[in-house]
Design a protein with these regions (language model features):
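A short beta-loop-alpha structural element at the N-terminal edge
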Residues: 5-19
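Conserved GNAT-fold acetyl-CoA-binding loop/helix
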Residues: 18, 25-46
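Conserved acyl-donor/pantetheine-binding loop and adjacent beta-alpha core of acyl/acetyltransferases
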Residues: 71-105, 166
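Conserved catalytic-core motifs of GNAT/GCN5-like acyltransferases
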Residues: 77, 138-139, 151-172
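Conserved acetyl-CoA-binding loop-helix of GNAT-fold acetyltransferases
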Residues: 106, 112-125, 148-152
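Conserved beta-strand-loop-alpha-helix junction that forms the acyl-donor binding cleft
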Residues: 111, 137-147, 166
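Conserved active-site alpha-helix within GNAT-family acetyltransferase domains
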Residues: 117, 129, 141-159
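Conserved GNAT acetyl-CoA-binding A-motif
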Residues: 127-139
Length: 179
């Protein structure tokens, strides 16, 4: 694939981010798991908030077409304060020294072209630049493609967390990578 450019998304990118997330939601449905399949998550409000807070990043090809997205936050995630297991680093959302990855997706037309790897590499670069000691992420236990990617990128499964939003299947495998 030609070069992938990654940049912080702005308000005008919201429709493109939403499209990529719908593509990701459809790909997850094809796996036969419930992640992102109940209710409206992720929705317009989630994307608009990510963009407004500077947490949303967009991967594009040389024509400017949206290929993938990732939400990267340095604010801590209270959901991660209660883990059935143990994090590799000892920090809570109140004094977060970790970056959190959420809402990652790739347009199905761009699958297997290194987009997610590029997004994760940029997230790691930004996390290091921000002085984070680690990165955390979570995914559905049945999302084997994402679990495999996290492990290939050096993340360690640390236990399970429970989502705080309304979800009939709230258990997620929690991962951390020490930087």
């Amino acid at each position: 694939m030609a070069d992938i450019a990654i940049r912080r998304a702005h308000e005008g990118d919201i429709p493109s981010v939403e499209h990529v997330l719908r593509e990701g939601k459809a790909a997850i449905a094809e796996l036969g798991i419930s992640q992102w399949q109940h209710g409206t998550y992720p929705n317009h409000e989630d994307v608009a908030r990510d963009v407004a807070q500077g947490h949303c990043y967009l991967a594009e090809d040389e024509t400017g077409a949206a290929l993938g997205t990732i939400a990267l936050s340095f604010d801590g995630d209270p959901t991660y304060d209660a883990i059935d297991g143990a994090w590799l680093t000892q920090t809570t959302s109140a004094n977060a020294r970790y970056a959190t990855i959420h809402r990652t997706a790739v347009d199905r037309a761009a699958a297997r072209r290194g987009v997610m790897s590029a997004l994760f590499a940029e997230a790691e670069r930004l996390s290091r630049a921000a002085g984070c000691e680690s990165m955390r992420a979570d995914t559905h236990p049945g999302n084997t493609p994402m679990r495999g990617l996290l492990e290939r990128k050096g993340f360690t499964a640390c236990g399970t967390i429970l989502l705080t939003r309304d979800d009939p299947d709230p258990v997620r495998v929690a991962y951390e990578k020490v930087l």
